[in-house]
């Protein structure tokens, strides 16, 4: 039974639940509980039995529901929320530590990256690969790409591949380009770009599918490396009050590792896995073959692992100016990247055929679409297949959905209402972490359309919040903050080039990383709010999200995380602990 409790009705509802609920084996008391239920109710305490929430109410009422041997967590006035959910995170991909990590704030200029590459090279034999991730030209003092000529200075005898923070482009040194056979005569592959200097010589920067010219040569990580990385990233998520994630683009190897950890009872984060559908009907068909053997959501493995659907690509990156737009990309905000409107990563007609195939199989699909033209194509495709085969509840999504047109917004609103489909899966931290790049590439006429949360809300569109980690840092507190503040990291084009007209309040921002995100994972009956009948996925914070200045939200510290009533993170030194 799902019962929402407001402070005005704690007494009567508490007595009702006492008569109908089993004795609680765990209670949380003396806190401020932000339930994120339909009424946004606030309570003091929570009763839990066998990992399920049985009551929410006042301290007095919840203590009456506790069994004699119940464990008690005194919140000491701290604030509890539902466990936070990331609706788009490359969980397993990011779980493996790269040899060279260059995404942290200590990287100020290209020479800082080169220092780390040089240090890694010193530990390797000549010919061994150096791989890294996380660079972003928008954070460099030089405001330019890293080139092969830069890397050659510190790694003349070792092939190097450094992936951009977006994952949509990267840079190889000359040794890697030589192994890949990339020369000035090499043609751009379909849906890819080999960046070249004014003489036509490759610079080392490879975009979209061109990355595969080098990436396929890099030795894969071992099973043990991937397993250890996954255990580590789950612990890191729990430390940030996070308990569920939608992992896009997995393949059989990744699914098998999830199954392995599930059997060993080592999953401390719920996983909704989207299978990689690629950019062709054959790759989408292969994904469907895997999915056909597994339960469809909301059915799952022990409530912790779901085989959720298929991810496919429509276009590229806003950071790399490869996303498919109606008008030319800008360059440096007021300049023009003349003739460059990006391009579809999947041929548009092939994409439409793929969606027909996936939808026809009764399977959920989420599509990567960043550019306005790409988003229009995606929502029109969803509209077409849903009219041809009306199916409610597959919840087809638009990943990123950065620059939607008015047409796209109206179509999404209608699809959500009529078919429970067409949901944006948004990354508010884009505005912060890679926002300077976006502001420069979109230009002053389009920049305030980025991630239009307030417009979505006004049209009745709900979305799931996410990070796209490792594109941006994964803690959901950053996404909650960015949804409200819309500030960039370095203020290259001003502190708030995206404006504040599309900002939302903290209640909406929190809901996008809890109740609404749970719906994107088909788990809204299990998690996403603190209500009787749901699993006790709960995070406890050092301050009240609803009352602190919004700029403090990115500094939130998690003190305790529960997954089904089990402690999966306890902050050292915190008084909030199981007693």
What are the residue ranges of the model-derived segments?
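Short, charged, surface-exposed secondary-structure boundary motifs
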Residues: 83, 281-285, 434-438, 492, ...
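Acyl-CoA/ACP chain-elongation machinery
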Residues: 402
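Short beta-strand segments in beta-sandwich/barrel cores
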Residues: 32-34, 51-54, 519, 538-539, ...
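Extracellular/periplasmic ectodomains of large secreted or surface enzymes and adhesion receptors
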Residues: 570-579
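His/Asp/Glu-enriched, well-ordered alpha-helical/loop segment
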Residues: 355-366, 373-396, 406, 417-422, ...
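Catalytic cores of alpha/beta
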Residues: 407-412
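Bacterial N-terminal signal peptides
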Residues: 2-16
């Amino acid at each position: 039974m799902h019962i929402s409790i407001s402070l005005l009705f704690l007494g009567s509802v508490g007595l009702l639940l006492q008569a109908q609920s089993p004795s609680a084996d765990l209670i949380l008391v003396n806190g401020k509980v932000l339930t994120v239920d339909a009424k946004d109710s606030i309570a003091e305490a929570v009763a839990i039995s066998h990992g399920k929430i049985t009551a929410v109410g006042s301290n007095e009422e919840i203590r009456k529901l506790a069994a004699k041997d119940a464990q008690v967590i005194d919140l000491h006035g701290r604030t509890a929320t539902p466990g936070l959910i990331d609706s788009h995170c490359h969980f397993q991909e990011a779980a493996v530590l790269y040899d060279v990590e260059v995404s942290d704030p200590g990287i100020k200029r290209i020479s800082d990256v080169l220092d780390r590459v040089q240090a890694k090279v010193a530990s390797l034999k000549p010919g061994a690969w150096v791989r890294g991730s996380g660079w972003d030209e928008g954070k460099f003092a030089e405001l330019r790409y890293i080139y092969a000529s830069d890397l050659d200075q510190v790694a003349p005898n070792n092939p190097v591949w450094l992936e951009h923070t977006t994952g949509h482009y990267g840079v190889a040194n000359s040794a890697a380009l030589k192994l890949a056979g990339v020369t000035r005569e090499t043609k751009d592959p379909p849906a890819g770009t080999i960046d070249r200097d004014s003489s036509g010589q490759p610079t080392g920067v490879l975009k979209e599918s061109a990355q595969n010219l080098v990436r396929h040569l890099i030795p894969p990580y071992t099973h043990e490396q991937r397993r250890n990385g996954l255990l580590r990233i789950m612990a890191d998520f729990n430390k940030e009050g996070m308990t569920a994630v939608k992992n896009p683009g997995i393949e059989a190897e990744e699914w098998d590792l999830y199954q392995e950890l599930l059997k060993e009872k080592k999953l401390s984060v719920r996983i909704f896995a989207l299978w990689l559908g690629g950019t062709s009907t054959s790759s989408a068909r292969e994904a469907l073959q895997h999915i056909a053997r597994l339960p469809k959501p909301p059915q799952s493995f022990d409530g912790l692992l779901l085989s959720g659907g298929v991810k496919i690509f429509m276009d590229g990156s806003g950071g790399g100016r490869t996303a498919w737009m109606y008008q030319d990309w800008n360059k440096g905000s007021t300049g023009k990247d003349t003739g460059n409107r990006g391009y579809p990563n999947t041929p548009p007609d092939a994409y439409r055929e793929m969606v027909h195939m996936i939808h026809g199989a009764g399977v959920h699909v989420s599509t990567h679409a960043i550019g306005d033209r790409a988003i229009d194509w995606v929502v029109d495709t969803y509209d077409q297949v849903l009219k041809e085969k009306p199916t409610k509840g597959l919840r087809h999504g638009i990943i990123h959905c950065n620059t939607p047109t008015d047409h796209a917004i109206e179509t999404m609103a209608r699809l959500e209402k009529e078919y429970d489909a067409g949901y944006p899966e948004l990354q508010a931290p884009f505005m912060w972490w890679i926002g300077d790049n976006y502001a420069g590439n979109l230009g002053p006429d389009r920049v305030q359309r980025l991630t239009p949360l307030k417009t979505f809300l006004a049209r009745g569109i709900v979305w799931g919040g996410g990070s796209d980690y490792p594109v941006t840092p994964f803690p959901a507190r950053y996404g909650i903050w960015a949804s409200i503040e819309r500030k960039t990291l370095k203020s290259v084009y001003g502190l708030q080039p995206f404006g504040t007209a599309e900002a939302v309040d903290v209640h909406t921002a929190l809901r996008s990383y809890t109740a609404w995100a749970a719906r994107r994972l088909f788990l809204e009956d299990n998690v996403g709010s603190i209500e009787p009948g749901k699993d006790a996925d709960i995070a406890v914070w050092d301050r009240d999200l609803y009352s602190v200045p919004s700029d403090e939200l990115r500094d939130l510290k998690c003190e305790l995380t529960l997954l089904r009533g089990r402690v999966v993170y306890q902050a050292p030194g915190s008084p909030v602990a199981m007693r």
